[in-house]
UniProtKB/Swiss-Prot annotation:
It is an enzyme of class 3 (hydrolase). Keywords: Carbohydrate metabolism, Hydrolase. Pathway: Amino-sugar metabolism; N-acetylneuraminate degradation; D-fructose 6-phosphate from N-acetylneuraminate: step 5/5. Belongs to the glucosamine/galactosamine-6-phosphate isomerase family. NagB subfamily. It comes from the Bacteria. One of its GO terms (cellular component) is cytoplasm. GO terms for biological process: carbohydrate metabolic process; glucosamine catabolic process; N-acetylglucosamine catabolic process; N-acetylneuraminate catabolic process. It catalyses: alpha-D-glucosamine 6-phosphate + H2O = beta-D-fructose 6-phosphate + NH4(+). The keyword Hydrolase applies. This is Glucosamine-6-phosphate deaminase. The active site is at 62 (proton acceptor), 128 (for ring-opening step), 130 (proton acceptor), 135 (for ring-opening step). Its EC number is 3.5.99.6. Catalyzes the reversible isomerization-deamination of glucosamine 6-phosphate (GlcN6P) to form fructose 6-phosphate (Fru6P) and ammonium ion.
């Protein structure tokens, strides 16, 4: 696990984008993408670059259950707004949170991942150590699955909604085993509220109680953090 300390989120996005360019030069064609506030500066770098994404495939980590794609809090909307409208990809996959049969959708998404192995995966990390929507206690062997979101995650995401009652209670998430199958993983974290999770991820025991700790077992992980997120590291 390589750790790169940066001044702020802006620099973090630039560093992540430079790593992406290196991966693309080495033949990467499939990107695993994340949502939320953490990767926004990475997407801004991508949008403002001259990079042509028309031959690339993207696979998103997760999507809320029950939100229409036109809802501005759906991850489908987020990805179009932050990236795809400006930089169309050859193919862009997200879980369908409106599927009538969620278990069938889970199987479909596992098939998508199997057919498009991820070369470069962007991750954030939750305060409780979640990656994707893989909450504490999720099996490291889990593939795509329907998640009941923990209260801490619902509370953290409520800032994006009019009321905490509007936050979806479930999501479809790529599993930890799916994430670990990526060739390269770049995890971004900024702010003091992520410091405890970063410490556990980097130097704590590998435990399903802190999902991100499994990244210690991956042979190509780069962690990009600001000083606040790094503040509990030795």
């Amino acid at each position: 696990m390589k750790i790169i300390r940066v001044q702020d989120q802006l620099e973090g996005g630039k560093v992540a984008f430079s790593l992406l360019k290196e991966s693309l030069a080495e033949g990467a064609t499939t990107l695993g993408l994340a949502t939320g506030s953490t990767p926004i500066t990475f997407y801004q770098e991508l949008v403002n670059s001259d990079l042509d994404c028309s031959a690339l495939t993207s696979i998103n980590l997760d999507e809320y259950v029950g939100l229409p794609v036109e809802n501005d809090q759906s991850y489908d909307y987020f990805m179009r707004d932050q990236l795809f409208n400006a930089k169309p990809f050859k193919e862009s996959f997200l879980p369908n949170g409106l599927a009538d049969d969620l278990e069938a959708e889970v199987k479909r998404y596992d098939q998508v991942i199997a057919e498009h192995p991820i070369d470069f995966q962007i991750l954030g990390i939750g305060r409780n150590g979640h990656i994707g929507f893989n909450e504490p206690g999720t099996s490291f062997a889990e593939k795509t699955h329907v998640v009941d979101l923990q209260a801490s995650t619902i509370e953290a995401n409520s800032r994006f909604f009019a009321s905490i009652d509007d936050v979806p209670k479930q999501a479809i998430s790529m599993g930890i085993a799916s994430i670990m199958a990526s060739k390269m993983i770049v995890l971004l974290a900024f702010g003091k509220e992520k410091a405890a999770a970063i410490k556990g991820m980097v130097s704590g025991p590998v435990t399903e109680a802190l999902p991100a700790s499994v990244l210690q077992q991956h042979d190509n992980v780069v962690v990009i953090i600001d000083e606040a997120a790094a503040s509990e590291l030795d």
